Amino acid sequence: MHELASNVQEQAGSFKDADALNIAFRFWRPAGEARATVVIVPGFNAHSGYYSWVAEQLVAERLAVYAIDLRGRGKSEGERFYVDDFADYVSDIAPLVDLVKSRETGLPVFLLGHSAGGVAACLYALDHQQTLRGLICESFAYELPAPGFALSAIKGLSHVAPHAHVLHLKNEDFSRDPKVVQAMNADPLIAQESQPAETLAALIRADELLKQSFARFTLPILILHGTADKAAKASGSQHFYETAGSADKTLKLYEGGFHDLLNDTGKSEVMGDITRWIDAHLTT
C-alpha cells in the first residue's frame, strides 16, 4: 500500500497553521511539467501515507499530488484525533491549497476528500469554489450508520466528556484486501485510533451545516461510494448528488465496495474513473 514505483519520489513537507500547529503533508510530482494538482484530505483511520499508490497513478497522468495530515492525525501536531470544530480542519486545508498554488503556479487544483476528510473538503470548497477546478468526494461521511438517538447521545456526551474516546472504527470495514487491513493494524499512527466524543459531535454539526448548504455548490463534483460501506452510508452521497446545486455533477456507486475505495480490491476501477473525470475537466 505504501510502495512506490522507482520513478515516483515521495517527499515530505510541513507548515504552521493558524493555531501554530505544525501540519505535515506529503507530495509527489511528475518528472516533467505537471498538468494540474490534486490535493488529498484523508479521513479517519488514515493519513497521507495511505495515498502513495494513488499518487503513483496520478503522477503517471502528469498530475502533482499533495496529501495532508489534518491536525491531530498522521505526523501533524495537535491532540490525537481531536477537533472541536471542522472549521479547524478547513483552516489546515486552506494554507496547503495556498502553498500548492504558489508552488504549482497557474495549474488547476482538484480537491479530493475521503470520508470525514470529504466533509472537511466540502466545507473548504463551499467558500473557495473559484479556487478549485473540481471537488472529488469519496465515501462521504454525511450519513452515519447510527440511529438518531445515538447521534444525539454523542452530542450530549461531548458537553460532559469531550475528550473521551468513544468510537473505534474497524480496519476490516475499510478494505476487502487483507494486506491493506494487516498494514493498517500494524501502522503505529492509527493502531490505537479512536474518535473523541467532541470530534464526532463536530462531524455531526458539520454534516448538519452542509445539509443546509448543498444547493450553494456550483463547481464540478465527482461523488464516489461503495454500496457495502459500513462506516458511512451510500445514501448520504446519493443525497449530496441530488441536492448539490452544481450543474456538472457525477455520482458513481461501486457494488460491494468498502469504505476506503482507493485501498479496496476495486481500486483500479475507482482510480480510472477519477483520472478520466479529471482529464475531462482539464479539456473543457
Set out the residue ranges of the language-model regions.
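Alpha/beta-hydrolase-fold enzymes
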Residues: H114-Q195
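Conserved alpha/beta-hydrolase "acid-adjacent" motif
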Residues: K230-G236
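Conserved alpha/beta-hydrolase
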Residues: Y50, A55-G78
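Catalytic active-site module of serine/aspartate enzymes centered on a nucleophile-bearing elbow/loop
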Residues: E255-T284
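Short beta-strand/loop motif that positions the catalytic acidic residue
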Residues: F217, I223-H225, D229
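Catalytic nucleophile-loop/oxyanion-hole region of alpha/beta-hydrolase
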Residues: N45-S48, G74-E104, V270
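N-terminal cap/lid segment of alpha/beta-hydrolase-fold proteins
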Residues: M1-G32
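Alpha/beta-hydrolase fold nucleophile elbow
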Residues: E104-S115
